[in-house]
Amino acid sequence: MSQHWKLETDEAGIAWLCIDKADADANVLSSDVIQELNEHLESLGKNPPTGLVLNSGKERSFIMGADINEFKDFSSPEEVAKMCHLAQQVFLKIRALPCPSVAAVNGVCLGGGLEISMMFDYRIGPPGDSKIFGLPEVKLGLHPGFGGTVRAVQICGVRAGMQLMLTGNPVNSRKALKIGLIDRIAGEDDWRDVATSLIATRPPVQKAPLVDRIMGIGLLRPIVRNMLIKQVSGKARKDHYPSPYAMIDLWAAHGASSKTGYLAEAESFGRVACTDTSRNLIRVFFLQSKLKKQGNKTDVELKHIHVVGAGVMGGDIAAWCALRGHTVTLQDREQKYIDPALERAQKLFGKRVRDEKKRAETAARLKADVSGDGAAEADLIIEAIFENLEAKQDLYKALQAKMKPGALLATNTSSIRLEELRTVLDEPKRFIGLHFFNPVAMLPLVEVIRCEDTDQAAMDIGFAFTKGIGKFPLECMSAPGFVVNRVLAPYMGEAMALAKEGVPLEEIDKAAVNFGMPMGPIELVDSVGLDIAQHVAGILTSGTDREMPDTDIAGLVKKGHLGRKTGQGYYLWIDGKAVKPAADGVPVPDDIEDRLLLPMVNEAVACLSEGVVADSDLLDAGVIFGTGFAPFRGGPVNYARERGVDSVVAALKGLAERHGERFAPHSGWSGL
């Protein structure tokens, strides 16, 4: 009795094979699913049908990929390679059948799902703009392991095939058709007819373009390999992210050879799967799921969002909410303050919404509201004005007089504690924080902030709203700087202290980037704005017992050198880019990396110890998605554990002896 597959043969002798994983919302290729598939393919091999069609029993979802949970059970590269090779042998039985075969894809088709579909002679994709076809393994520190490195190049060619695998970015059906990944586009009503027609007519199967086949000739492969390596090295270092380099080397050694490519792929997959990079990136994948599971289900429907404050943060929050389907009113003192936000919104919609009609509908959902009438209709009001306690409280008094029953008020404050803000409210327990990060369209985290006695129903609405607009919520307690800003502050502060000591700015940033940060801390300070960084540092200094180092920030702010927005900060900025002078031979401290990163790790441990976040997993997730902390290191607490807690504490003590008590290990280290 098959648990996950259903096989039927029609009067024409066509076998219709449907995958519908039992007790699951989505199809994944777990070991038992693959074993059952093997049994069906063995049977079909003995009694070949006139054609084979694979489809999914899940609505708008084909196959999500391999079961990542099973990867935790493997202990050696050899064990992983054996698993991959066994799966390959099962999938290759599809290609060995003497009849034409069709994979009818109805929705998300990622990783192993796309790999199995590429074993079929023909592939059908659904209509629509959704990007459902992809090989995202590289984002987990892996590469395709079920035959994808061979078949993607055989079908699409080295250019398009490698692009799919090296970026991990999915494509929609139109793009898939253009690069040869699928053969037809058909909807729910006609995919069966299209599949039957393909089996009956047997058109030529997709092959890589001639140019790509020439590029795969042995003498040319080393040249193409070097081009691919150059492309990848500009985005990821081999010691940080080895899998894209392994992918390129696989192709350089084997091309798209069916004879040697599959086994080599399995062995390479085994090696990358057992690296710290892959283990940590898989951990980050599961951390995303943990963030999404926060909060209870709520029946409250948020249709209308009212945002007060049309500055960079407020305006971009409003635009993002409109993009995600909400009706949004944006309030500020005068229309001239709202207009720049509307202009930025139009640019966002132009990039994100391809269809002109849908783009116009999206833009129509965002309305300027100088009078603030939208507050009376809103289900959720987000305050995003400047960081001033009295100004915010005056606004709250006016808003609560307008709000309809059941509406929720939230603040986007980055530094003021909720306990102080809410004292003027009639229902202080229903007041929450929704702290977004800049740029709103790029950074996926929102801190959902509470006080000790905050109403859980209000928090659940905050969680639902955050997830509904495609962001990751992080629950945290009201505390100075909350989580992300608090952890970032000592990192940026130490960078500015190094700058004051005369360490070249470029060398400071280089040390952080070499660790794996997305940009250096000096460039980050300039991007955030020196005035904002100074303000947050002041809040943290007064609200915690942490000492901030001596820096030049006050003098730069006094001169009006605020960073990128004024064209001058620590760096000179031209056309939105920092001009970084070459280091002039000034010696760089041996402990520069620890001086930058360990204060950040120390502050993360302090947040955990003080209960600002519930556990180390959530803290690591928040810092990764809120700051870009090197994902392949798994977060600050995970990094400390991998390096060794005793080793990190000893390093902090050494830094404290040399540079001051601000490096002293927090008492929370004893709890790790």
What do these predicted ranges mean?
Residues 1-55, 92:
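Conserved CoA-thioester-binding segment of acyl-CoA-metabolizing enzymes
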Residues 8-10, 22, 49-52, 74-76, ...:
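N-terminal glycine-rich phosphate-binding loop for ADP-containing cofactors
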Residues 17, 36-37, 54, 67, ...:
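Terminal peptide-recognition signature
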Residues 18, 55-56, 104, 435:
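Short beta-strand segments
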Residues 32, 46, 59-73, 91:
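Amphipathic alpha-helical interaction surfaces in cytosolic regulatory modules
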Residues 37-40, 44, 116, 317, ...:
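Structural preference for long, well-ordered alpha-helical segments in enzyme cores
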Residues 88, 93-140, 144, 312:
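Glycine-rich beta-to-alpha active-site loop
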